[in-house]
């Protein structure tokens, strides 16, 4: 509490934040879509091995959020301002990333959709219940 947080690229970064319930839902649905031995693999064209079919599937909403907006949601949920240590861009980092959930949606019909305005307060409430 009260410790400064490092904010890289002076907050001029975007990330695709995924709420835990969306992640669990995506994994649960993917488990039901797992290849079964001896049966044709649906969407096998994206599998890297015909012998042991497997996939890398992004689970994210594909909606990048500005880091400063994310921090603002945390501040709002906690009812106090963050102590920010503004830092330059770090070597090897990128200004924006987001998930492409097209394969997830094709396999399961699901795409994560919980906005940070819902997910961040829920996370903060959960944390407070357990650790405050």
Q: Where on the chain are the PLM-derived regions?
A:
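C-terminal substrate-binding subdomain of Rossmann-fold SDR/epimerase-dehydratase oxidoreductases
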Residues: 1-132
């Amino acid at each position: 509490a009260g410790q400064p947080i490092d904010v890289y690229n002076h907050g001029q970064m975007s990330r695709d934040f995924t709420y835990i319930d969306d992640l669990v839902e995506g994994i649960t649905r993917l488990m039901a879509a797992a290849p079964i031995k001896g049966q044709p693999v649906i969407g096998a064209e994206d599998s890297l091995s015909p012998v042991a079919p497997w996939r890398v599937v992004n689970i994210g909403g594909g909606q990048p959020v500005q880091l400063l907006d994310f921090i603002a949601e945390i501040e709002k949920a906690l009812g106090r301002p963050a102590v920010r240590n503004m830092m330059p861009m770090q070597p090897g980092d990128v200004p924006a990333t987001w998930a492409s959930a097209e394969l997830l949606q094709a396999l399961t019909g699901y795409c994560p959709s919980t906005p940070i305005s819902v997910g961040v307060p829920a996370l903060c409430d959960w944390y407070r219940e357990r650790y405050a």
